[in-house]
Design a protein with these regions (language model features):
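Short intracellular "coupling" helices and adjacent cytoplasmic loop segments at the cytosolic face
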Residues: 44-51, 58-65, 153, 160-167, ...
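Helix-loop-helix
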Residues: 306, 310-327, 331-333, 337-338, ...
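Alpha-helical transmembrane segments
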Residues: 25, 29-33, 224, 229, ...
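An intracellular "coupling" helix at the cytosolic face of ABC transporter transmembrane type-1 domains
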Residues: 10, 166, 264-265, 281-290, ...
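Membrane-integrated ABC transporters
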Residues: 1-32, 36-223, 228, 232, ...
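Juxtamembrane helix-loop junctions of ABC transporter transmembrane domains
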Residues: 28-44, 216, 225-268, 272, ...
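ABC-type nucleotide-binding domain
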Residues: 15, 51, 65-67, 87-88, ...
Length: 749
């Protein structure tokens, strides 16, 4: 996993922006339940009245309320209100409500600079007393209304006119009543203060306006917050996708560059199918994981911690339900992961296996049909496919079983909250909106743990993919450029002739205990053709691979113009070579693009000259599009001979100093072979030509012929010399040519 985070660290700026946006999104998610609670509790149940402080109040009602306050509190209330059009700056909402009064009452408006929290404490007890008095005036079984409030205020006003009335006596009676009431009774009466404000608004004819104003304002804030959350979520998704895509791009680029630098031994170590899987499937797995890490792993802790803080601030006694839900969820995930995790590790290997079988079948479809092995290969593919299917079915079933259980836990959690929360609502210690908010916070906390556990399921598989990719990226190629100090100082100014020399070379393939080549010693001179012939598996191709540095020698040295190839940059060495592999390889594109594959400086004239020398001009001209004719992937839309001639033309167009032909003429008929070699001899001029061949006719006129047997040179010389001195060469020659063709007198060797 640390490998994935290292890749993310390269995009730290974008990650910081994503975290900032996630904080904005989490703020919205955590604030919306509060607004929902306010809409239910305040906007609906309390008719939009948030506290015990009326924003608009009649003079008559305010005077009665002040009677029930201390002198200091009454003075504070007087200072907090102003008359319409007075010198004080009234609250904007109070001014708006004053314009909607049903009758021209004499009212006071709450000042904009009033301390509402302090006023709420001051108004609380007088509001409760006045509401209870209004309820008593309404009569048993009747809800108090504006008329009852008017009756009570009139009674209080009349009482103040009675002889012997004392405000201090009223305060003393009120204090005694409060002292006799228990704390629970006072808590239960706290909501009555808001109801008194509702009666006052009802008397003023603005109760509906107050409620609608509150709902519109709160709903507007919720809408604005929701839009902000949506914008943040969209930006998070965009940035996370871009970061993940950039990481995937860099990984694919890194894997490609590393694979291109691999020698044949590293390619054999990983296998082509595995390298393809690592470059595609594994990189895609990491890309998906990076998106999830940025969108979920970073978001889940923010949401969970924020939900816990809100629940703690609410001081609810239902927090044990959250602990129970999280514990059950973690237990469920732990049990399921014990079954699923081993299968996730196996799945990647099975994907490699399926890719390998598919590649073998598709590349070998012709031999499969020729030998009627379709059923056998179908059985092979079916076995690999079935193994992968069974593993995927098992993991999918485990993951599918997770969702019903998690749904059960979440629904059970909601049920417990409603059950125990309902009892608290009945007791008056919780409001409906608060319970709704608590359910929402609980779901957010549970979902945050759920997101983390879901990511925990994916991370091991992504970790395996990251390890597989890292294995490729950290594998050092066996063939690498020399350090600058080891490169000859005059190499860049060196005039290359192309003389290739093997100095007592030994070579052993990686992992093998026996030499593939032993004590190879010869010189291939410019302007001459050196041919290498021998039985299958004697080391002919291996010898060419040492010149190209596909492998390095294990003993001795290979030099070009006296410079050890290991002391030359690979680009310099291969810039001197025109290599035609044993199996012609073409790339998707056109004939022209394939022939110009050897370098950027190849002109159209070079292409046409090379095609003419390689005897490819005739069939190219016969195509409607000529040199712009398309070539399918792997050259599947041309014949074997045409593919080989195009491969030869590609090497010729480069005008190299050294030509390497690895049994390149075997796919050609004799007539084309002779014509091609005749034209090639005129073209190569002073270049060094090294030909690996199976046919004697191909090497008959070479200046130097090397006969290989079991990795050793058993003969060296011209055709005539070898016919006299090398039994191995004589055996090959007699098996292919008649005595007349061998130009032997009397039919004898």
């Amino acid at each position: 996993m640390t490998k994935i985070f290292k890749h993310l660290a390269k995009h730290w700026a974008a990650c910081l922006v994503i975290i900032a946006l996630l904080l904005v999104q989490a703020y919205g998610d955590l604030t919306l339940p509060d607004y929902t609670s306010k809409i239910v509790d305040t906007g609906i149940q309390q008719s939009g009245i948030a506290d015990a402080v009326p924003e608009v109040v009649r003079d008559s009602t305010l005077q009665v309320l002040e009677l029930l306050m201390t002198d200091a509190d009454a003075a504070a209330v007087e200072a907090a209100y102003t008359q319409p059009g007075g010198t004080g700056n009234a609250l904007s909402s109070a001014t708006s409500l004053q314009k909607k009064l049903a009758s021209p009452y004499t009212v006071r408006l709450l000042r904009a600079d009033a301390d509402r929290d302090t006023l709420a404490e001051v108004f609380s007890t007088p509001d409760i007393v006045l509401y209870l008095a209004s309820a008593q005036a309404a009569g048993e079984g009747n809800a108090p209304d504006a008329a009852a409030l008017d009756t009570v205020t009139a009674q209080f006003a009349a009482m103040t006119q009675m002889p012997g009335f004392s405000r201090d006596a009223v305060q003393a009676q009120l204090a005694a009543a409060i002292g006799q009431a228990g704390e629970s009774e006072l808590s239960g009466l706290s909501a009555q203060a808001v109801l008194l404000v509702g009666l006052e608004y009802q008397a003023l004819g603005i109760s509906d306006a107050v409620q609608m104003n509150y709902l519109i304002q709160t709903g507007g804030r919720m809408l604005g917050l929701t839009l902000l959350m949506v914008a943040a979520a969209v930006l998070v998704g965009l940035l996370a996708s871009r970061v993940a895509a950039a990481i995937a791009r860099d990984l694919r680029r890194g894997v490609f560059r590393r694979v291109v630098s691999f020698s044949a031994s590293e390619t054999d170590k990983f296998s082509t199918a595995s390298l393809i899987t690592r470059t595609t499937n594994d990189v895609q797995q990491i890309q998906m994981t990076c998106v999830i890490l940025l969108r979920m792993v970073a978001y889940a802790p923010i949401l969970g911690i924020g939900g816990i803080i809100h629940v703690a601030q609410a001081g609810s006694s239902l927090t044990w339900i959250i602990v129970l839900a999280v514990a059950l969820l973690l237990a469920l995930i732990t049990v399921l992961m014990q079954f699923a995790m081993p299968k996730f590790r196996i799945m990647q290997k099975l994907v490699d296996r399926l890719n390998l079988v598919s590649r073998e079948i598709l590349t070998g479809i012709m031999p499969i049909r020729a030998f009627s092995r379709e059923q056998h290969e179908e059985a092979r593919f079916d076995a690999a496919n079935t193994d992968l299917m069974r593993t995927q079915l098992f993991t999918n079933r485990v993951m599918a079983a997770m969702m019903p259980f998690m749904t059960l836990i979440m629904n059970g959690t909601s049920l417990l909250i409603v059950w125990f929360g309902g009892k608290q609502i009945d007791a008056g210690t919780m409001q409906v909106g608060s319970m709704i908010a608590f359910i929402t916070y609980t779901m957010q906390i549970v979902m945050s743990f759920l997101m983390l556990t879901m990511v925990a399921v994916m991370l091991p598989r992504a970790g395996v993919a990251a390890d597989r990719i890292d294995e490729v990226l950290t594998t050092e190629p066996a063939i690498h450029d020399p350090v600058p100090e080891a490169i000859p100082a005059d190499l860049n100014q060196h005039h290359w002739n192309g003389e290739v020399a093997f100095h007592h070379v030994n070579f052993t393939y990686p992992g093998s205990s026996e030499d593939a080549l032993h004590d190879i010693d010869f010189v291939a001179k410019p302007g001459q053709t050196t041919a290498i012939i021998g039985s299958t598996g004697c080391g002919k191709t291996s010898l060419l691979h040492l010149i190209t540095r596909f492998y390095d020698v294990t003993g001795g040295s290979v030099t070009v113009d006296g410079v050890d190839v290991r002391q030359m940059p690979q680009s310099t060495l291969r810039g001197l070579l025109g290599y035609v592999p044993q199996k012609g390889v073409l790339f998707s594109g056109t004939i022209d693009s394939n022939l110009k594959f050897g370098g950027e400086n190849i002109t159209d004239a070079d292409v046409r000259s090379a095609a003419r020398i390689a005897q490819a001009e005739e069939f190219i001209s016969a195509k409607p599009e000529g040199y712009e004719s398309p070539i399918a992937q792997g050259g599947t839309n041309v014949s074997g001979g045409q593919k080989q001639r195009l491969s030869i033309a590609r090497a010729i167009a480069k005008h190299p100093k050294i030509y390497l032909f690895d049994d390149s003429f075997s796919a050609l008929d004799y007539k084309t072979d002779v014509a091609l070699r005749r034209a090639l001899k005129a073209e190569t001029g002073d270049a060094t030509v090294i030909i690996v061949a199976q046919r004697i006719s191909t090497v008959l006129h070479a200046n130097q012929i090397l006969v290989l047997e079991d990795g050793r040179i058993v003969g060296k010389g011209t055709h005539a010399q070898l016919m006299e001195s090398c039994p191995a060469y004589q055996e090959i020659a007699r098996s292919q040519l008649s005595n007349k063709e061998l130009d032997l007198k009397g039919g004898e060797a």
